[in-house]
Amino acid sequence: MAAISDVDSKKNIIIKGAKLHNLKNIDVIIPRNKLVVVTGLSGSGKSSLAFDTLYAEGQRRYVESLSSYARQFLGKLDKPKVDYIKGIAPAIAIEQKVNSTNPRSTVGTTTEIYDYLKLLYARIGKTVSPISGEEVKKHTVSDVTDHVKSFPEGTKLLLLAPITIKENRDPLKSLQLFSKQGYARIKYQGKVMRIDQVPEDIGRQFDLVVDRIVVKTDEDFYNRLGNAVDNAFFEGKGQCALEDLGQDTITVFSNQFEMDGMKFLEPNVHLFSFNNPYGACPKCEGYGDVIGIDEDLVIPDTSLSIYESAVFPWRGETMSWYKEQLVNSAYKFDFPIHKPWYQLSERQKQLVWDGNDHFIGIHKFFQQLEEKSYKIQNRVMLSRYRGKTKCSVCKGKRLRKEANYVKVGDTSISDLIELPIKKLIPFFDKLQLSEHDTEIANRLLKEIVTRLDFLNKVGLSYLTLNRKSNTLSGGESQRINLATSLGSSLVGSMYILDEPSIGLHPKDTENLIDVLQSLRNLGNTVIVVEHDEDIMKAADEIIDIGPEAGTLGGHVVAHGTFNEILMSTSLTAEYLNGTRSIEVPTARRNSKNYIQIKGARENNLKNIDVTFPLNVLTVITGVSGSGKSTLVRRILYPSILKEVGGYGEKAGQFTKIEGKYGHIKHVEFVDQNPIGRSSRSNPVTYIKAYDDIRSLFASQKLSKIRGYQAKHFSFNVDGGRCEKCKGEGEITVEMQFMADVHLECDVCEGKRFKKDILEVQFEGKNVDDVLNMTIDDAIQHFKNHKQQKIVTKLQPLQDVGLGYVTLGQSSSTLSGGEAQRIKLASFLVKGETKEKALFIFDEPTTGLHFHDIKKLLKSFDELIEKGHSVIVIEHNIELIKCADYLIDLGPEGGENGGFLVAEGTPEEIADRIDSHTAKYLKEKL
């Protein structure tokens, strides 16, 4: 390798002496405008290099170039611990955080597609009257003069303005005013008469003759006519008429935007914005839902028919009268009372809610209860069915009704954003516009179509633009950010992505690789922190950080193309070239216990029956959007939680739950949310090992002499902790106009405790030294000094592959995958209980190297051996091949998903032709 000083910084990004966290003063050269993968064990220092060093420096330099006024909103960025970085480009990081909790944020607004749609509808939308279906137009002065031009020269016309005199005015006085303004005639009851000759008893409605016209062709005539038409529109309050005296025909013009007796709003951008009071539905203010009668509570079981009392409040002696009304009169309007609710058409469902002349609908039923809410039983009844419900005015469309009269290609904007992306693309491809509209819309359509195309490529074709951002999974929101970045087509930037393959089925990974390569081909450097073998194969260069994790990591162990990496001796290379592998179990476990969910039909699930075997490793697979999370998160978890006596969210729509699961006493859903928000929360407090460590320090000789107890070694209560920073180790300085600055506490120097507490040592280490040890080091230290109780509690953290984390590392700095594994470890600590639990994991391999997946599988086996059950949602084939039982949903995502494609052992599924998972599974088996 050439000396680092000789490398050309125009073609490479040069990092010299990176020493942040566990990085061992390393030099790295990253080629510019290439796709580079950074890989290595969890905790080896990949993120420290990619995010905390490269991104931090790219961001910092960009911010430094801004004015001080702009900088105050961006906060101060620390310089990373590195000698220097040359050739760096402006950095964009795309992380896996589900970033939006805003209920107004949707896929359309995040990707900016909705902004372009608003413009499109405002510019070329045609307003259509809901009464006649005709296009609403307003006339201008030139429309009237053009009409006059169509008559032959010499034709006699009258230009009229319709007048209506108000109740409190005298018609004769009003006519005198017109006379003073220079008007001489009116037309009343079909006759033209002079104003000074009108009868005394004239009515309040007549036409004012603004001008008598003899058609000519010269310029002056049309100039005079233009002024006259202006006056006619003014006097007629926006209306005027041309009467052809020869043919006795009248043509009416209006410069108001109206038709069929309705006034319409002229399209503008704000009309289509649900975040603007002008365009938002007045009832729900643009949220799409309101607090009201919750449909799911009123009809909790959609597999029942009206006859079987699907409408829950219409049960019991008093209320069944409402049901009888509908059942007895259904034949009059041909309503199927024996059909299950979920099979009814939208119109039939709406009828039950709205009612008709023969029966009272659900809406009216609750209205009657509200009118008599002074009765206690009515108030109880109402409170039982209250919840978030679709807004009754806009039907969840978020916009005022006038916005939906505007159409492009016969479709309103609300209907458009309800279509999945894969149907939107053909809609715009087939859109036929006039030449004039095409010229206006061309650039907008180009932006819309490219962005839709990117969403399609990153595997999100099943989403609708109206989907709320806060209901997306981590992988989905990351890929939406990726598509948004692509849509803005920046050039010469540095994109740093954190495991974009999360939540992607191997089938979708191929498209993702195309997207990353197209980002590179635009002229950007794309740096990806990734463990996925397919993405590594597609990379131009791979940087492997290792050899192990934590203090044993932080070196560059291999650097080069995929084939060069295969020749090296790093752990990554050994798993890639087959020296090491994750073994396929020789026998699959089977079990007599199971949970069966019948008739699952939430979101896109197609009324399926699914059996989950217990006491084994059950894995749910399927492409993105096939319904895995819906089945497990929305149906299995809340329903089994209720069965074992827990209190959970309301379950999604399904018929019933049955099976042999009496031995399960707890249900744990282990997701990737942080284990604690407070900066004092850390792994060792979470698994309750810190209590033993404090007791150990309190039992030392010096502690006894000074009277210290366990609480003196806690940084959560007063006593031993530093008084100035309250055990935080840092002081937060609030800057009025800038971001808060965190400074190391000058009293304890970041050690959290008072000086005299730190004088207490156990085998040469004080409490601060212990908190700064990695878990691997701490286990060794306590083992050597016979502290088995502490070792037993720390061991599971090492088993799940977190040996590199320090005992006192703040929870807020842990990644989603790490937080999930700490939760897993805390359950392994409790392990040997009589009460058996069901563990549900959502993509536990996030952020895991092959070597770590091996450890994770060992932890799962340990839980199962202790009699617990494990159900996992997963895309990683290495984990899928080790399952005892697979449940494959699909075949595609979105509308074409939600079916049970296959279930059984991996061997049974590998032979299936109709399953996407089978193809990839076969290669591994």
Predicted regions and their residues:
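Conserved phosphate-binding elements of NTP-dependent enzyme cores
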Residues: 1-925
